[in-house]
A protein has these predicted regions:
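Alpha-helical scaffold elements adjacent to nucleotide-binding pockets in ATP/GTP-utilizing enzyme cores
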Residues: 26-31, 49-53, 144, 159, ...
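P-loop NTPase Walker
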Residues: 1-61
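Hydrophobic "anchor" residues on beta-strands that sit immediately upstream
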Residues: 41, 147-150, 177
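Conserved catalytic network of the ASCE P-loop NTPase/AAA+ motor domain
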Residues: 6-9, 36, 139-141, 168-172, ...
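Accessory N-terminal region flanking or inserted into the helicase ATPase core
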Residues: 15, 73-149, 158-163, 188-196
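Conserved RecA-like helicase ATPase core segment
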Residues: 163-225
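Conserved Walker B
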Residues: 148-156, 182-183
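DNA-processing P-loop NTPase/helicase core
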Residues: 60-66, 177
């Protein structure tokens, strides 16, 4: 909201990266309640960001995607995992994760390529590959962005940090903001890395200002006490 009000004439995009769709909707609803013009605001998850700004516009530059692709959801991924494990003669119980086995992971990746399908993990991997192999992609994206806000950054993984870093370094006039609490990291088991201020400064080659919120805006003071 501040970025829009600070320069209302700017057509450059203000990016808000959230961890869930619900969080993105909450941002949109709050801005709507404040009567903020949202025409230059984009809010969504990192996977949605990669699809919107990298995969869809630049799929033709990916050997894997240039002849078409289909995105599968987590339900389909789990079904594939079970089918592959069964085909490999593995006897798993209901709670076993077939993807803990390397041979299942290898066959799963082969099947996806054969069927011209990608999952959520592949969205990030291919996005990073495109940014690394085609520098102009990062430059093009960075040229239309004025700011990037990452919410709950403590749950961001290394691949996501890398994607955002590449885009930022293509245009260091972009305003960067990471919001979160390293003490509330809950997705470390899924690869989330709660980087400290110094680590972020090293990765993004920028000096960050650190600000702390002293109050609690989710609970009553009685509950906090």
């Amino acid at each position: 909201a501040y970025q829009v009000l600070r320069d209302p004439a700017s057509k450059k995009i203000k990016i808000a990266i959230t961890y869930t769709n619900r969080a993105a909707e909450e941002i949109t609803n709050r801005l709507e309640g404040m009567n903020i013009d949202q025409s230059s605001i984009w809010a969504g998850t990192i996977h949605q960001f990669c699809m919107h700004f990298i995969i869809r516009p630049y799929a033709m530059y990916s050997k894997r995607l240039c002849k078409g692709y289909r995105i599968i959801d987590d339900y389909s991924k789990k079904a594939y995992g079970r089918e592959i494990a069964e085909r490999l003669g593995m006897h798993l119980n209901y709670y076993d994760d077939p993807f803990q086995y390397e041979n299942v992971r290898t066959e799963y990746k082969r099947v996806l390529k054969e069927k011209k399908e990608i999952d959520f993990d592949a969205i990030l991997l291919i996005s990073e590959e495109l940014l690394a192999s085609c520098a102009f992609i990062g430059s093009n994206i960075a040229s239309v962005i004025s700011s990037i806000l990452v919410d709950e950054f403590q749950d961001t993984n290394e691949l996501q940090y890398s994607i955002l870093s590449t885009i930022y370094k293509a245009n260091k006039s972009i305003i960067l903001m990471f919001v979160g609490d390293v003490n509330q990291a809950i997705y470390s088991s899924l690869g989330g890395v709660a980087k400290g201020k110094k680590e972020l400064e090293t990765l993004y080659e920028i000096n960050f200002d650190s600000l702390s919120l002293k109050g609690c805006y989710r609970s009553t003071q009685r509950l906090v006490d």
